[in-house]
From Swiss-Prot:
Record PANTHER family: 50S/60S RIBOSOMAL PROTEIN L14/L23 (PTHR11761), LARGE RIBOSOMAL SUBUNIT PROTEIN UL14M (PTHR11761:SF3)
Membership in a protein family: Belongs to the universal ribosomal protein uL14 family.
Origin organism lineage: Bacteria, Pseudomonadati, Pseudomonadota, Betaproteobacteria, Nitrosomonadales
Originating gene: rplN
Protein name: Large ribosomal subunit protein uL14
Protein role: Binds to 23S rRNA. Forms part of two intersubunit bridges in the 70S ribosome.
GO process terms (BP): translation
């Protein structure tokens, strides 16, 4: 469960290391975001020679949360950290590699590119 001011790790090779959620997209009163939701993020920590610089604002999709996601069969999938993949304005991933596992819930028409790049789909 991600809200404003939440810090997330970046699960791609864009050069950003840590981002902070500055807005949960999808309604004026929406407070929380989960796996598969798009948020606005500000880059807090970046690699020296990366594509993305500190202070820039991007869209991102959440791929892992410590809160987890409940499946229809009753199982609960949780992760150790909160992680996101940075997107451009067309909601396509900027990076060319994804690090760590992602969940099956991303397997929609919008995020099939992320699922295909991921090393493991849980």
């Amino acid at each position: 469960m991600i809200q404003m001011q939440s810090l997330l790790k970046v699960a791609d090779n864009t050069g950003a290391r840590t981002v902070m959620c500055i807005k949960v997209l999808g309604g004026s009163k929406r407070r929380f975001a989960g796996i598969g939701d798009v948020i606005k993020v500000a880059v807090k920590d970046a690699a020296p020679r990366g594509r993305i610089k500190k202070g820039e604002v991007y869209n991102a999709v959440i791929v892992r949360t410590a809160k987890g996601i409940r499946r229809s069969d009753g199982s609960l999938v949780k992760f150790d950290t909160n992680a996101a993949v940075i997107l451009n304005n067309k909601l396509e991933p900027i990076g060319t590699r994804i690090f760590g596992p992602v969940t099956r819930e991303l397997r929609t028409a919008k995020f099939m590119k992320i699922v295909s790049l991921a090393p493991e789909v849980i």
